[in-house]
Each structure stands twice: as C-alpha cells, then as structure tokens.
Amino acid sequence: MLHVLSPLLADFCAQYPQIEIELGSNDHLIDLIEERTDVALRIGRLQDSAMHARLLGHTAIRILAAPAYLAQHGTPQSAADLAQHRLLGFTAPTTLNQWPLPDGRGGLLEISPAVRASSGETLRHLALAGNGIVCLSDLMTFTDRESGALVPLLEHEREHVSQPLYAVYYRHRTLLARTAVFIDFLAQQVAKMPWYRAQA
C-alpha cells in the first residue's frame, strides 16, 4: 500500500501541515490500539466486527506474468494450461489463492502455488523477476501492466472479480479530526486512480 500512499502525501501535508504522519507497513493484520494506529488500509473482505470501515473503492484482480517468464516457459492459452506452469500464491488465507477463472463447478479456480509468500508486494517482486505467474490486484500492478513489466494472461476467461479497499478504525474509538480528514482525503484521491472502481 505504500506505493499508493507515497505519491499522495505531499498534497496531504501541504493541505494539513499541522498533522504529523507516521507510516507503518505490515503483511499481517495488526491491533490498531496496541500499535497506536489511527487508521489502516485493508484490501479484501473484513473479518473484525470491532472495526468501523469506510469503503474507498474496488480494484480488479488479474493473472499476470513477466515477459521473461513467458519467453522461457510459454504463454498459457487456457486455465487448464496453468497446471504446467509455476504459480505464485499466498501463504494465507487460502481464499487469496482462488483465481478469477471458472473451475468448471460454478466457483473460482483454486490453485496450488509452487511458491508462497505472505505479502502481495513480495509476490509482485517475484513475478517481476520472472519467477512465475501471479494473481494480484490492479491497485498493486497497474503501473507494471502499463509499462509492460507484467503481462495480463487469460483475459478471455477471466471472471470480473474485484476486491474492496477499506480505511478501518476501531468502532469504540472516537473518530479523531486528523483521522477523519485523512480518510476523506484518501477517498477523494483513490477515486482518481486509474485502477479505481466504484463498484465490485
């Protein structure tokens, strides 16, 4: 998420110079109170009912690979071809390894990764280095696709699946003014992003 936030911070700091910002990056869900965190950004379905959440938008997910990987291993022409390729996936939860391809039983194709990582950003770097085929959000990979560093695959079979992006904070905590203006700012800026979708 830092690659999304970083370009926005100069404008936010110019508008609100009195607000001090401390950023943290974590691959796992954190306790916001224990970590003294006002707001967190989360992608995907929320599990914690103790959270207030503001939906900032949605982002599509796609199957991607680097040109170098495809040059060496070939380009899959169908979902069935993926069985012959090195797939990159998440350690947990397993739902993140359900790719937006039909499984023939009315659901999504669940893959068995050859390489697993806990972080989408780690998987992105593995894919960029030619280590295999990955499924990630447009939020994370839009610039890679635009530059040609990652190539979309199986677009003709891809289900139009997207993930929600939320700003979350604890339900029992009074929303601080600084948090409110930051969330409002994020909502305005995210809506301008090229990967943004208002609805799933």
Give each language-model segment a name.
Residues 1-52, 199:
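Central regulatory/effector-binding core of bacterial HTH transcription factors
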Residues 50-88:
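Flexible hinge/capping segments at coil-to-helix
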Residues 86-105:
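Secondary-structure junction motif
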Residues 142-147, 157-200:
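C-terminal effector-binding regulatory domain of bacterial HTH transcription factors
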